[in-house]
Design a protein with these regions (language model features):
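Catalytic domains of cell-wall/extracellular-matrix polysaccharide-remodeling enzymes
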Residues: 368-455, 510-515
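Non-catalytic propeptide/linker segments at domain boundaries
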Residues: 201-256
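Metal-dependent polysaccharide deacetylase catalytic core of the NodB/CE4 family, i.e.
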Residues: 57, 140-141, 286-413, 468, ...
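A glycine-rich, often tryptophan-bearing local segment used as a flexible ligand/cofactor-contacting loop or short
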Residues: 108, 112-179
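Catalytic beta-strand/loop cores that center a nucleophilic Ser/Cys/Thr
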Residues: 163-218, 224
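Catalytic grooves of carbohydrate-active enzymes
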Residues: 256-266, 270, 379-402, 408, ...
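Aromatic-Pro/Gly-enriched surface loop or interdomain linker
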Residues: 8-102, 253, 280, 289
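C-terminal domain-boundary segment and adjacent tail
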Residues: 89, 243-253, 271, 275-297, ...
Protein backbone atom coordinates (compact mmCIF):
# COMPACT_ATOMS: atom_id res chain seq x y z
CA UNK A 1 0.00 0.00 0.00
CA UNK A 2 1.00 3.61 -0.28
CA UNK A 3 1.67 4.16 3.42
CA UNK A 4 1.39 7.83 4.27
CA UNK A 5 1.67 10.65 1.82
CA UNK A 6 5.35 11.42 2.34
CA UNK A 7 6.30 7.86 1.49
CA UNK A 8 4.53 8.12 -1.84
CA UNK A 9 6.75 10.69 -3.49
CA UNK A 10 9.96 12.64 -3.19
CA UNK A 11 10.36 15.66 -0.93
CA UNK A 12 13.05 18.22 -1.66
CA UNK A 13 14.06 20.71 1.04
CA UNK A 14 14.23 24.39 0.19
CA UNK A 15 17.84 25.55 0.49
CA UNK A 16 18.77 29.04 -0.66
CA UNK A 17 20.45 32.17 0.64
CA UNK A 18 18.01 34.44 2.46
CA UNK A 19 18.22 38.22 2.59
CA UNK A 20 16.86 40.36 5.45
CA UNK A 21 13.43 41.90 4.93
CA UNK A 22 11.41 44.48 6.82
CA UNK A 23 9.65 43.25 9.93
CA UNK A 24 5.97 42.33 9.60
CA UNK A 25 3.47 45.12 10.20
CA UNK A 26 0.33 43.02 9.71
CA UNK A 27 -1.19 41.69 12.90
CA UNK A 28 -1.80 37.94 12.60
CA UNK A 29 -5.35 36.70 12.75
CA UNK A 30 -6.17 35.73 16.33
CA UNK A 31 -7.39 32.22 16.99
CA UNK A 32 -11.17 32.16 17.04
CA UNK A 33 -11.55 35.16 14.72
CA UNK A 34 -13.07 33.12 11.92
CA UNK A 35 -15.29 34.96 9.46
CA UNK A 36 -18.45 33.26 8.19
CA UNK A 37 -17.70 30.25 6.02
CA UNK A 38 -18.22 30.83 2.30
CA UNK A 39 -21.17 29.27 0.54
CA UNK A 40 -19.79 26.53 -1.65
CA UNK A 41 -22.00 25.04 -4.33
CA UNK A 42 -21.03 21.37 -4.32
CA UNK A 43 -23.17 20.65 -7.37
CA UNK A 44 -21.21 23.21 -9.37
CA UNK A 45 -17.90 21.61 -8.45
CA UNK A 46 -18.64 17.95 -9.09
CA UNK A 47 -16.56 16.30 -11.82
CA UNK A 48 -17.98 17.27 -15.21
CA UNK A 49 -18.27 13.61 -16.18
CA UNK A 50 -20.29 12.74 -13.07
CA UNK A 51 -23.92 11.82 -13.73
CA UNK A 52 -26.70 12.04 -11.14
CA UNK A 53 -28.21 8.97 -12.77
CA UNK A 54 -25.19 6.77 -12.00
CA UNK A 55 -25.52 5.16 -8.57
CA UNK A 56 -23.20 2.42 -7.36
CA UNK A 57 -23.57 -0.03 -4.49
CA UNK A 58 -20.25 -0.81 -2.77
CA UNK A 59 -20.22 -3.93 -0.59
CA UNK A 60 -17.23 -4.73 1.60
CA UNK A 61 -15.89 -7.09 4.27
CA UNK A 62 -15.48 -5.62 7.75
CA UNK A 63 -15.35 -8.37 10.36
CA UNK A 64 -12.51 -9.16 12.76
CA UNK A 65 -9.15 -7.57 13.50
CA UNK A 66 -8.44 -6.96 9.80
CA UNK A 67 -11.80 -5.38 9.12
CA UNK A 68 -10.10 -2.01 8.74
CA UNK A 69 -8.64 -3.19 5.42
CA UNK A 70 -12.12 -3.72 4.03
CA UNK A 71 -13.23 -0.29 5.19
CA UNK A 72 -10.21 1.32 3.54
CA UNK A 73 -10.73 -0.60 0.30
CA UNK A 74 -14.33 0.59 0.25
CA UNK A 75 -13.16 4.17 0.85
CA UNK A 76 -10.69 3.99 -2.04
CA UNK A 77 -13.38 2.56 -4.31
CA UNK A 78 -15.90 5.20 -3.25
CA UNK A 79 -13.40 7.91 -4.12
CA UNK A 80 -12.89 6.51 -7.62
CA UNK A 81 -16.61 6.05 -8.17
CA UNK A 82 -16.97 9.70 -7.20
CA UNK A 83 -15.75 10.41 -10.72
CA UNK A 84 -18.87 8.83 -12.19
CA UNK A 85 -21.74 9.47 -9.81
CA UNK A 86 -23.04 8.76 -6.33
CA UNK A 87 -22.53 5.64 -4.23
CA UNK A 88 -23.69 3.80 -1.15
CA UNK A 89 -21.19 1.73 0.84
CA UNK A 90 -22.21 -0.93 3.34
CA UNK A 91 -20.89 -4.21 4.76
CA UNK A 92 -21.74 -7.14 2.50
CA UNK A 93 -23.20 -8.93 5.52
CA UNK A 94 -25.96 -6.29 5.69
CA UNK A 95 -27.14 -6.85 2.12
CA UNK A 96 -30.86 -7.43 1.63
CA UNK A 97 -32.49 -9.22 -1.30
CA UNK A 98 -33.16 -7.15 -4.42
CA UNK A 99 -31.00 -4.26 -3.25
CA UNK A 100 -28.61 -4.22 -6.19
CA UNK A 101 -31.47 -3.69 -8.64
CA UNK A 102 -31.74 -0.13 -7.35
CA UNK A 103 -28.24 0.71 -8.57
CA UNK A 104 -26.47 1.17 -11.89
CA UNK A 105 -23.80 -1.32 -10.84
CA UNK A 106 -22.53 -3.17 -7.79
CA UNK A 107 -18.92 -3.59 -6.62
CA UNK A 108 -18.11 -6.30 -4.08
CA UNK A 109 -14.69 -5.98 -2.43
CA UNK A 110 -13.37 -9.29 -1.12
CA UNK A 111 -10.68 -7.92 1.18
CA UNK A 112 -10.86 -10.69 3.78
CA UNK A 113 -10.44 -14.37 2.95
CA UNK A 114 -13.06 -16.88 4.03
CA UNK A 115 -16.02 -14.57 4.51
CA UNK A 116 -19.49 -16.12 4.39
CA UNK A 117 -21.72 -13.98 2.20
CA UNK A 118 -25.53 -13.70 2.38
CA UNK A 119 -27.32 -16.08 0.05
CA UNK A 120 -29.51 -13.17 -1.03
CA UNK A 121 -26.43 -11.38 -2.34
CA UNK A 122 -25.09 -14.43 -4.16
CA UNK A 123 -28.46 -15.22 -5.72
CA UNK A 124 -28.94 -11.62 -6.87
CA UNK A 125 -25.47 -11.48 -8.43
CA UNK A 126 -26.23 -14.67 -10.35
CA UNK A 127 -29.62 -13.44 -11.59
CA UNK A 128 -29.18 -9.71 -12.20
CA UNK A 129 -28.61 -8.16 -15.62
CA UNK A 130 -26.85 -5.15 -14.10
CA UNK A 131 -23.03 -4.91 -14.08
CA UNK A 132 -21.29 -6.52 -11.12
CA UNK A 133 -17.57 -6.12 -10.37
CA UNK A 134 -16.20 -8.70 -7.94
CA UNK A 135 -12.73 -7.93 -6.58
CA UNK A 136 -10.43 -10.24 -4.65
CA UNK A 137 -11.40 -13.04 -2.29
CA UNK A 138 -14.51 -15.16 -1.72
CA UNK A 139 -15.37 -15.75 -5.38
CA UNK A 140 -15.71 -19.43 -4.40
CA UNK A 141 -18.87 -18.50 -2.48
CA UNK A 142 -20.46 -17.38 -5.75
CA UNK A 143 -19.16 -20.33 -7.75
CA UNK A 144 -20.49 -22.84 -5.24
CA UNK A 145 -23.89 -21.16 -5.12
CA UNK A 146 -24.48 -21.53 -8.87
CA UNK A 147 -25.85 -24.88 -10.13
CA UNK A 148 -23.05 -25.02 -12.71
CA UNK A 149 -20.94 -21.88 -12.60
CA UNK A 150 -18.48 -23.03 -15.28
CA UNK A 151 -21.29 -23.75 -17.73
CA UNK A 152 -22.91 -20.37 -17.09
CA UNK A 153 -19.81 -18.16 -17.08
CA UNK A 154 -17.14 -20.11 -18.94
CA UNK A 155 -14.52 -20.05 -16.20
CA UNK A 156 -13.76 -21.44 -12.77
CA UNK A 157 -11.11 -20.38 -10.26
CA UNK A 158 -8.77 -22.79 -8.50
CA UNK A 159 -6.35 -21.45 -5.86
CA UNK A 160 -4.36 -18.35 -4.99
CA UNK A 161 -1.28 -18.18 -7.17
CA UNK A 162 1.54 -16.74 -5.06
CA UNK A 163 4.15 -16.73 -7.82
CA UNK A 164 6.12 -13.47 -8.11
CA UNK A 165 4.30 -11.28 -10.64
CA UNK A 166 6.08 -8.17 -11.94
CA UNK A 167 3.72 -7.19 -14.75
CA UNK A 168 0.04 -7.05 -15.57
CA UNK A 169 -0.73 -6.63 -19.26
CA UNK A 170 -3.75 -4.49 -20.00
CA UNK A 171 -4.83 -2.90 -23.30
CA UNK A 172 -1.40 -3.56 -24.78
CA UNK A 173 0.49 -1.92 -21.91
CA UNK A 174 2.69 -3.58 -19.31
CA UNK A 175 1.68 -2.25 -15.90
CA UNK A 176 3.89 -2.88 -12.91
CA UNK A 177 3.11 -5.24 -10.02
CA UNK A 178 5.30 -5.35 -6.91
CA UNK A 179 6.96 -8.76 -6.95
CA UNK A 180 7.13 -8.96 -3.14
CA UNK A 181 3.35 -8.75 -2.86
CA UNK A 182 2.78 -12.35 -1.77
CA UNK A 183 -0.94 -12.03 -1.01
CA UNK A 184 -1.54 -13.95 -4.22
CA UNK A 185 -3.69 -13.55 -7.31
CA UNK A 186 -6.56 -15.95 -7.93
CA UNK A 187 -5.69 -18.69 -10.41
CA UNK A 188 -8.06 -20.58 -12.72
CA UNK A 189 -8.79 -24.22 -13.34
CA UNK A 190 -10.39 -23.36 -16.67
CA UNK A 191 -11.24 -20.38 -18.89
CA UNK A 192 -13.36 -20.89 -22.00
CA UNK A 193 -12.33 -17.92 -24.12
CA UNK A 194 -15.32 -18.38 -26.40
CA UNK A 195 -17.57 -17.38 -23.50
CA UNK A 196 -15.27 -15.39 -21.21
CA UNK A 197 -13.05 -12.47 -22.10
CA UNK A 198 -9.66 -12.10 -20.41
CA UNK A 199 -9.37 -8.36 -19.78
CA UNK A 200 -5.90 -8.31 -18.20
CA UNK A 201 -3.14 -10.87 -17.81
CA UNK A 202 -0.68 -11.44 -14.96
CA UNK A 203 2.86 -12.29 -16.07
CA UNK A 204 4.97 -14.45 -13.75
CA UNK A 205 8.71 -13.97 -13.36
CA UNK A 206 9.33 -16.98 -15.64
CA UNK A 207 7.21 -15.42 -18.41
CA UNK A 208 4.18 -17.66 -18.01
CA UNK A 209 0.79 -15.99 -17.72
CA UNK A 210 -2.67 -16.38 -16.22
CA UNK A 211 -5.77 -14.16 -16.16
CA UNK A 212 -5.75 -11.13 -13.86
CA UNK A 213 -9.26 -9.99 -14.78
CA UNK A 214 -12.02 -11.80 -16.69
CA UNK A 215 -15.53 -10.91 -17.80
CA UNK A 216 -18.47 -12.99 -18.90
CA UNK A 217 -22.06 -11.88 -19.19
CA UNK A 218 -22.45 -8.98 -16.76
CA UNK A 219 -19.85 -10.20 -14.23
CA UNK A 220 -16.29 -8.81 -14.10
CA UNK A 221 -13.88 -10.60 -11.78
CA UNK A 222 -10.51 -9.18 -10.68
CA UNK A 223 -8.31 -11.76 -8.97
CA UNK A 224 -6.73 -9.54 -6.31
CA UNK A 225 -7.32 -6.31 -4.42
CA UNK A 226 -5.58 -3.73 -6.64
CA UNK A 227 -4.95 -1.15 -3.89
CA UNK A 228 -2.04 -3.06 -2.34
CA UNK A 229 1.49 -1.70 -2.94
CA UNK A 230 0.59 0.75 -5.67
CA UNK A 231 2.79 3.08 -7.72
CA UNK A 232 2.40 5.55 -10.59
CA UNK A 233 2.70 2.75 -13.18
CA UNK A 234 0.80 0.09 -11.26
CA UNK A 235 -1.88 -2.42 -12.28
CA UNK A 236 -4.37 -0.39 -10.23
CA UNK A 237 -4.69 1.67 -13.43
CA UNK A 238 -6.46 -1.30 -15.02
CA UNK A 239 -9.04 -1.26 -12.24
CA UNK A 240 -9.39 2.53 -12.58
CA UNK A 241 -10.20 2.08 -16.26
CA UNK A 242 -12.45 -0.98 -15.92
CA UNK A 243 -14.86 1.10 -13.85
CA UNK A 244 -15.77 2.95 -17.05
CA UNK A 245 -17.17 -0.25 -18.58
CA UNK A 246 -19.77 -0.50 -15.83
CA UNK A 247 -20.41 3.17 -15.06
CA UNK A 248 -19.61 5.20 -18.19
CA UNK A 249 -19.30 2.82 -21.16
CA UNK A 250 -19.77 5.64 -23.67
CA UNK A 251 -16.97 7.80 -22.26
CA UNK A 252 -14.78 9.16 -25.02
CA UNK A 253 -11.04 8.69 -25.12
CA UNK A 254 -9.10 11.79 -24.08
CA UNK A 255 -5.86 12.40 -22.24
CA UNK A 256 -5.21 15.65 -20.40
CA UNK A 257 -2.22 16.89 -18.41
CA UNK A 258 -1.63 19.22 -15.47
CA UNK A 259 1.52 20.86 -14.13
CA UNK A 260 2.04 22.78 -10.89
CA UNK A 261 4.98 24.85 -9.66
CA UNK A 262 5.57 23.77 -6.08
CA UNK A 263 6.64 25.04 -2.64
CA UNK A 264 6.60 28.78 -3.28
CA UNK A 265 6.88 30.91 -0.14
CA UNK A 266 8.03 34.42 0.88
CA UNK A 267 11.74 33.53 0.62
CA UNK A 268 11.51 31.95 -2.84
CA UNK A 269 13.73 33.27 -5.62
CA UNK A 270 11.42 35.45 -7.72
CA UNK A 271 13.62 35.12 -10.80
CA UNK A 272 13.26 31.33 -10.72
CA UNK A 273 9.49 31.66 -10.58
CA UNK A 274 9.43 34.02 -13.55
CA UNK A 275 11.77 31.76 -15.51
CA UNK A 276 9.47 28.74 -15.12
CA UNK A 277 6.37 30.81 -15.94
CA UNK A 278 7.99 32.26 -19.05
CA UNK A 279 8.79 28.79 -20.37
CA UNK A 280 5.29 27.44 -19.77
CA UNK A 281 3.67 30.56 -21.24
CA UNK A 282 5.89 30.31 -24.33
CA UNK A 283 4.55 26.79 -24.86
CA UNK A 284 0.94 27.90 -24.36
CA UNK A 285 0.68 25.72 -21.26
CA UNK A 286 -1.56 26.83 -18.38
CA UNK A 287 -0.34 25.81 -14.94
CA UNK A 288 -0.95 26.00 -11.22
CA UNK A 289 1.41 27.13 -8.48
CA UNK A 290 1.30 26.30 -4.79
CA UNK A 291 2.09 29.04 -2.26
CA UNK A 292 2.60 28.86 1.52
CA UNK A 293 2.28 32.55 2.49
CA UNK A 294 4.06 32.56 5.86
CA UNK A 295 7.71 31.44 6.04
CA UNK A 296 8.82 29.99 9.39
CA UNK A 297 12.21 28.69 10.53
CA UNK A 298 11.84 28.55 14.34
CA UNK A 299 14.87 26.30 14.79
CA UNK A 300 17.06 28.77 12.85
CA UNK A 301 18.43 26.24 10.38
CA UNK A 302 18.96 28.95 7.77
CA UNK A 303 20.35 32.47 7.82
CA UNK A 304 17.91 35.22 8.89
CA UNK A 305 15.08 35.99 8.46
CA UNK A 306 13.62 33.15 10.49
CA UNK A 307 10.09 34.25 9.68
CA UNK A 308 8.67 36.31 6.85
CA UNK A 309 5.11 37.02 5.78
CA UNK A 310 4.17 37.22 2.14
CA UNK A 311 3.07 40.87 2.24
CA UNK A 312 6.60 41.78 3.44
CA UNK A 313 8.21 40.04 0.47
CA UNK A 314 7.44 42.44 -2.40
CA UNK A 315 9.56 40.59 -4.96
CA UNK A 316 7.68 37.33 -4.40
CA UNK A 317 4.32 39.14 -4.38
CA UNK A 318 5.20 40.71 -7.73
CA UNK A 319 6.30 37.31 -9.05
CA UNK A 320 3.00 35.72 -7.98
CA UNK A 321 1.06 38.38 -9.86
CA UNK A 322 3.36 37.80 -12.84
CA UNK A 323 2.61 34.07 -12.73
CA UNK A 324 -1.10 34.81 -12.76
CA UNK A 325 -0.71 37.05 -15.82
CA UNK A 326 1.15 34.21 -17.56
CA UNK A 327 -1.72 31.77 -17.09
CA UNK A 328 -0.94 30.49 -13.61
CA UNK A 329 -3.63 29.52 -11.10
CA UNK A 330 -2.87 30.14 -7.42
CA UNK A 331 -3.15 27.14 -5.08
CA UNK A 332 -3.06 27.53 -1.30
CA UNK A 333 -0.34 25.17 -0.08
CA UNK A 334 -1.09 25.46 3.61
CA UNK A 335 -0.27 28.46 5.80
CA UNK A 336 3.31 27.78 6.95
CA UNK A 337 4.06 24.29 5.54
CA UNK A 338 5.59 23.37 8.94
CA UNK A 339 4.77 22.97 12.63
CA UNK A 340 6.18 25.09 15.44
CA UNK A 341 6.03 22.21 17.92
CA UNK A 342 9.28 20.67 16.69
CA UNK A 343 10.76 18.82 13.75
CA UNK A 344 7.88 17.33 11.76
CA UNK A 345 9.70 15.32 10.59
CA UNK A 346 12.85 17.15 9.49
CA UNK A 347 13.74 20.64 10.72
CA UNK A 348 10.62 22.73 11.38
CA UNK A 349 11.24 24.88 8.33
CA UNK A 350 8.63 25.99 5.80
CA UNK A 351 8.68 23.74 2.76
CA UNK A 352 10.39 20.88 4.55
CA UNK A 353 7.88 19.84 7.19
CA UNK A 354 4.28 18.71 7.58
CA UNK A 355 1.70 21.22 8.86
CA UNK A 356 -1.48 19.24 9.61
CA UNK A 357 -0.28 15.87 11.00
CA UNK A 358 2.41 14.53 13.33
CA UNK A 359 5.22 12.80 11.46
CA UNK A 360 8.62 11.62 12.72
CA UNK A 361 11.84 10.35 11.17
CA UNK A 362 13.74 7.42 12.66
CA UNK A 363 17.53 7.19 12.80
CA UNK A 364 17.57 5.09 9.64
CA UNK A 365 15.63 7.78 7.76
CA UNK A 366 12.27 6.02 7.75
CA UNK A 367 9.16 8.19 7.97
CA UNK A 368 6.45 7.38 10.52
CA UNK A 369 2.94 8.83 10.49
CA UNK A 370 2.23 9.21 14.21
CA UNK A 371 -1.26 10.73 14.27
CA UNK A 372 -3.05 14.05 14.65
CA UNK A 373 -1.14 16.97 16.15
CA UNK A 374 -1.90 17.90 19.77
CA UNK A 375 -3.73 21.01 18.51
CA UNK A 376 -5.80 19.07 15.99
CA UNK A 377 -9.41 20.21 15.72
CA UNK A 378 -11.54 21.36 12.83
CA UNK A 379 -11.42 24.91 14.23
CA UNK A 380 -7.61 24.92 14.54
CA UNK A 381 -7.23 23.84 10.92
CA UNK A 382 -9.81 26.36 9.75
CA UNK A 383 -7.88 29.10 11.52
CA UNK A 384 -4.76 28.29 9.52
CA UNK A 385 -6.69 28.23 6.25
CA UNK A 386 -8.27 31.60 7.00
CA UNK A 387 -4.96 33.06 8.18
CA UNK A 388 -3.42 32.12 4.84
CA UNK A 389 -6.26 33.82 2.97
CA UNK A 390 -5.76 36.85 5.25
CA UNK A 391 -2.11 36.98 4.19
CA UNK A 392 -2.96 36.77 0.49
CA UNK A 393 -5.46 39.61 0.89
CA UNK A 394 -2.86 41.76 2.66
CA UNK A 395 -0.58 41.19 -0.34
CA UNK A 396 -3.20 42.33 -2.83
CA UNK A 397 -3.72 38.81 -4.16
CA UNK A 398 -7.17 37.32 -4.65
CA UNK A 399 -7.88 34.33 -2.43
CA UNK A 400 -7.15 31.00 -4.13
CA UNK A 401 -9.96 28.59 -4.93
CA UNK A 402 -7.87 25.40 -4.81
CA UNK A 403 -6.12 23.90 -1.77
CA UNK A 404 -3.19 21.50 -1.48
CA UNK A 405 -2.08 20.00 1.84
CA UNK A 406 1.64 20.35 2.60
CA UNK A 407 3.32 17.04 1.82
CA UNK A 408 -0.18 15.68 1.08
CA UNK A 409 -0.56 14.73 4.74
CA UNK A 410 -3.40 15.70 7.09
CA UNK A 411 -5.88 14.51 9.69
CA UNK A 412 -9.55 13.88 9.03
CA UNK A 413 -10.33 17.09 10.95
CA UNK A 414 -8.05 19.07 8.65
CA UNK A 415 -9.69 17.64 5.52
CA UNK A 416 -13.11 18.54 6.92
CA UNK A 417 -11.92 22.05 7.75
CA UNK A 418 -10.59 22.65 4.26
CA UNK A 419 -13.86 21.40 2.76
CA UNK A 420 -15.60 24.27 4.57
CA UNK A 421 -13.51 26.83 2.66
CA UNK A 422 -12.47 25.17 -0.59
CA UNK A 423 -14.54 23.07 -2.98
CA UNK A 424 -11.42 21.76 -4.73
CA UNK A 425 -8.15 20.14 -3.67
CA UNK A 426 -5.29 19.24 -6.02
CA UNK A 427 -3.19 16.49 -4.52
CA UNK A 428 -2.78 12.96 -3.33
CA UNK A 429 -4.69 12.44 -0.10
CA UNK A 430 -4.72 10.43 3.11
CA UNK A 431 -7.64 8.26 4.17
CA UNK A 432 -8.49 6.32 7.30
CA UNK A 433 -10.90 3.54 8.31
CA UNK A 434 -14.06 5.07 9.70
CA UNK A 435 -14.62 7.76 7.07
CA UNK A 436 -17.64 5.86 5.74
CA UNK A 437 -19.40 6.41 9.05
CA UNK A 438 -19.31 2.74 10.03
CA UNK A 439 -16.79 3.21 12.86
CA UNK A 440 -14.70 5.93 14.54
CA UNK A 441 -11.75 7.22 12.51
CA UNK A 442 -8.78 4.90 13.07
CA UNK A 443 -5.51 6.83 12.87
CA UNK A 444 -3.49 3.65 13.35
CA UNK A 445 -4.15 2.88 9.69
CA UNK A 446 -3.35 5.83 7.43
CA UNK A 447 -3.16 5.13 3.71
CA UNK A 448 -2.59 7.44 0.75
CA UNK A 449 -4.41 7.36 -2.57
CA UNK A 450 -3.83 9.16 -5.84
CA UNK A 451 -6.17 9.34 -8.77
CA UNK A 452 -5.91 9.12 -12.57
CA UNK A 453 -8.89 11.42 -13.07
CA UNK A 454 -10.95 14.05 -11.24
CA UNK A 455 -12.95 12.56 -8.37
CA UNK A 456 -15.33 13.64 -5.63
CA UNK A 457 -13.94 12.05 -2.48
CA UNK A 458 -15.33 10.95 0.87
CA UNK A 459 -14.33 14.26 2.48
CA UNK A 460 -16.85 15.99 0.21
CA UNK A 461 -14.38 17.74 -2.09
CA UNK A 462 -13.52 17.62 -5.74
CA UNK A 463 -9.94 16.36 -6.05
CA UNK A 464 -7.81 17.13 -9.10
CA UNK A 465 -5.29 14.37 -9.82
CA UNK A 466 -1.56 14.43 -9.20
CA UNK A 467 -0.48 10.99 -10.32
CA UNK A 468 3.08 11.27 -11.67
CA UNK A 469 4.94 12.79 -8.72
CA UNK A 470 7.84 15.19 -9.10
CA UNK A 471 11.41 15.42 -10.30
CA UNK A 472 14.27 14.62 -7.89
CA UNK A 473 17.66 14.95 -9.61
CA UNK A 474 19.41 13.11 -6.75
CA UNK A 475 18.63 10.89 -3.80
CA UNK A 476 17.61 12.67 -0.59
CA UNK A 477 17.24 10.81 2.71
CA UNK A 478 15.44 7.57 1.74
CA UNK A 479 13.93 9.06 -1.42
CA UNK A 480 15.40 7.94 -4.69
CA UNK A 481 16.38 9.90 -7.76
CA UNK A 482 13.48 10.55 -10.13
CA UNK A 483 14.13 12.09 -13.53
CA UNK A 484 11.90 13.34 -16.37
CA UNK A 485 12.10 9.95 -18.09
CA UNK A 486 10.51 8.35 -15.02
CA UNK A 487 7.59 10.78 -15.06
CA UNK A 488 7.12 10.32 -18.81
CA UNK A 489 7.16 6.55 -18.32
CA UNK A 490 4.39 6.92 -15.74
CA UNK A 491 2.42 9.14 -18.12
CA UNK A 492 2.68 6.44 -20.78
CA UNK A 493 1.27 3.84 -18.37
CA UNK A 494 -1.64 6.15 -17.55
CA UNK A 495 -2.72 6.14 -21.19
CA UNK A 496 -4.62 2.93 -20.42
CA UNK A 497 -7.17 5.05 -18.54
CA UNK A 498 -9.56 6.20 -21.24
CA UNK A 499 -10.26 9.60 -19.65
CA UNK A 500 -7.12 9.94 -17.59
CA UNK A 501 -4.55 12.56 -16.70
CA UNK A 502 -0.80 12.97 -16.51
CA UNK A 503 -0.35 15.39 -13.62
CA UNK A 504 2.92 16.37 -11.94
CA UNK A 505 4.61 19.15 -10.00
CA UNK A 506 7.96 20.91 -10.34
CA UNK A 507 10.11 22.82 -7.88
CA UNK A 508 11.21 26.07 -9.60
CA UNK A 509 14.61 26.06 -7.87
CA UNK A 510 15.59 23.07 -10.04
CA UNK A 511 17.21 23.48 -13.45
CA UNK A 512 14.64 24.42 -16.07
CA UNK A 513 15.82 21.60 -18.33
CA UNK A 514 13.99 19.11 -16.11
CA UNK A 515 10.69 20.91 -16.59
CA UNK A 516 11.21 21.15 -20.35
CA UNK A 517 12.02 17.45 -20.75
CA UNK A 518 9.00 16.40 -18.71
CA UNK A 519 6.52 18.70 -20.43
CA UNK A 520 7.73 17.86 -23.91
CA UNK A 521 7.82 14.12 -23.19
CA UNK A 522 4.24 14.19 -21.95
CA UNK A 523 3.10 16.20 -24.96
CA UNK A 524 4.71 13.69 -27.32
CA UNK A 525 2.48 11.01 -25.81
CA UNK A 526 -0.57 12.97 -26.97
CA UNK A 527 -1.61 14.62 -23.71
CA UNK A 528 -3.11 18.12 -23.79
CA UNK A 529 -2.17 20.45 -20.93
CA UNK A 530 -5.19 22.19 -19.42
CA UNK A 531 -5.71 24.75 -16.68
CA UNK A 532 -6.74 23.46 -13.25
CA UNK A 533 -9.32 26.25 -13.27
CA UNK A 534 -11.05 24.56 -16.22
CA UNK A 535 -11.75 21.47 -14.14
Amino acid sequence: MVVGAIAAFVLIPVRQELMPHSSPDLQPLEFGQLPPRPRISRAATLPAERSPKVRTLILYDHAGQWGWTGRLDATFTANLIGHFGSWKAQPASEYTGGELERYTATVYLGSLFGQRLPHALLDDVLSTQRPVIWVGYNIGELEDRAPDFRAQYGWRTSFLDRSPVATVRYKGASLTHWTHNDAGIMGYSSVDRSRARVLATAVRANGSTFPWAVRSRNLTYIGEMPFRYTSETDRVLAFDDLLFDALAPRARERHRALVRLEDINPVSDASQLRRAADYLHSKGIPFGFGVSPYYRDPQAHEDPPHELRLHNSPQVVAAIKYLERKGGVLVEHGYTHQWDGGSNPYDGQTGDDVEFYRVTESEDGQIHDVGPLPEDTVAWSEHRVVAANHEFAASGIAAPRIFEFPHYTASANAYRAVAHWFAVRWERSDYFPGLLGDSPVEYDHIEGQFFPYVVHDVYGSKVLPENLGSIAPSTWHTYKERLPADLVRAARANLVVRDGFASFYFHPFLALKYLKRTVEGIERLGYLFVSPASL
